[in-house]
């Protein structure tokens, strides 16, 4: 029996790893354990509850005001004890978080094999996104098995000298999650409030966008709201107090913008499915929205998901107020442009990524 441990700590990781946990547990060939770091606490627990997953280990590292130093040190110290106790044959980590980086580093020190889910995403700008671009490149050096969501991700890994025999294009597990969470008969009072309008879903929280860029983003949205009476915005706001302060200053006095607490994953995915278009600086939404046929304006200067840009489902609009406004306005005014983006092909797979990963692991001597 192969001892496989999955380690994750944030809400986005959990959304993409929980379907894989459930798929692995279907097979008697695997002894599966789950360790969460609690890098996000409340938001992580919501996802675990949605997928009905009980972690075997919880490092509970979350504290107010932690720096990247604190997070990394705490994970390294605590995950070491768990790894020494469990002695897994393989540890699976996801993406580019501090949890992923610190866990992979601990595995390297203990000579435990690492499998990297969502491997090969790159901007090649070490400062954007920060610190995620460094994290995923570092994990790429450590990982023995690389599960790339797309061919572009695979090519990135090959250019970096990774072993072709251990790179697998699987699609993105985010699409697997959507197949579980999105419901045709879903109801929520907020969606009732927005049902006679064009609903815009907004997410904004990235570290590199704090300060002036975020204020610029919000100013563009407020300008659109002032001009288009048939548009409403729902913004499930991040817990970061800097984000909350900026949102209150720029968006707080408009009755067609609802700033709400973070949604659990089932609610959030169904809000996306019922929206008209999406404005975001998130990574995961760039993968999820195309599967739902929703155009996405990406409020960042770079993206590690060029597949969506190439396919036409995403448009990179940066953090300049005028640029965001013009692209937002175009999609509201031009049906042809809107339809081109909403009907573009989804480059992130068909929702069978977890099955593919498990099949690969079944055939590997790990």
Model-based region annotation:
Residues 1-235, 240-366:
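Nucleotide-activated sugar donor-binding and catalytic core shared by glycosyltransferases
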């Amino acid at each position: 029996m192969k001892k496989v441990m999955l380690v994750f700590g944030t809400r986005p990781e959990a959304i993409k790893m929980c379907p894989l946990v459930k798929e692995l547990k279907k097979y008697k060939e695997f002894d599966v354990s789950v360790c969460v770091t609690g890098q996000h606490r409340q938001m992580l627990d919501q996802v675990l509850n949605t997928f009905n997953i009980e972690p075997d280990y919880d490092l509970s590292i979350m504290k107010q005001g932690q720096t990247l130093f604190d997070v990394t040190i705490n994970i390294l110290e605590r995950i070491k004890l768990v790894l020494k106790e469990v002695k897994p044959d393989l540890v699976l980590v996801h993406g580019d978080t501090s949890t992923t980086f610190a866990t992979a580093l601990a595995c390297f020190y203990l000579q435990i094999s690492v499998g990297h889910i969502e491997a090969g995403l790159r901007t090649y700008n070490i400062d954007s996104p920060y610190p995620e671009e460094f994290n995923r490149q570092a994990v790429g050096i450590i990982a023995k098995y690389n599960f790339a969501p797309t061919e572009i991700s695979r090519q990135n890994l090959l250019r970096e000298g990774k072993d072709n025999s251990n790179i697998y294009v699987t699609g993105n597990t985010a699409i697997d999650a959507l197949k579980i969470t999105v419901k045709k008969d879903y109801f929520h009072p907020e969606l009732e409030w927005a049902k006679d309008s064009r609903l815009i879903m907004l997410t904004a929280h990235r570290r590199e966008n704090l300060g002036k860029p975020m204020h610029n983003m919000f100013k563009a949205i407020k300008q659109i709201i002032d001009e288009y009476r048939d548009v409403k915005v729902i913004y499930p706001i991040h817990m970061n107090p800097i984000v909350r302060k900026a949102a209150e200053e720029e968006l707080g006095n408009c009755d067609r913008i609802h700033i709400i607490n973070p949604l659990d994953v089932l609610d959030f995915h169904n809000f996306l499915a019922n929206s008209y278009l999406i404005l975001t600086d998130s990574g995961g939404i760039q993968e999820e929205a195309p599967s739902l046929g929703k155009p996405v304006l990406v409020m960042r200067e770079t993206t590690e998901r060029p597949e969506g840009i190439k396919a036409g489902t995403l448009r990179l609009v940066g953090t300049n107020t005028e640029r965001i406004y013009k692209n937002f306005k175009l999609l509201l005014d031009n049906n042809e442009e809107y339809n081109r983006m909403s009907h573009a092909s989804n480059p992130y797979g068909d929702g069978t990524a977890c099955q593919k990963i498990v099949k690969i692991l079944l055939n590997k001597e790990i």
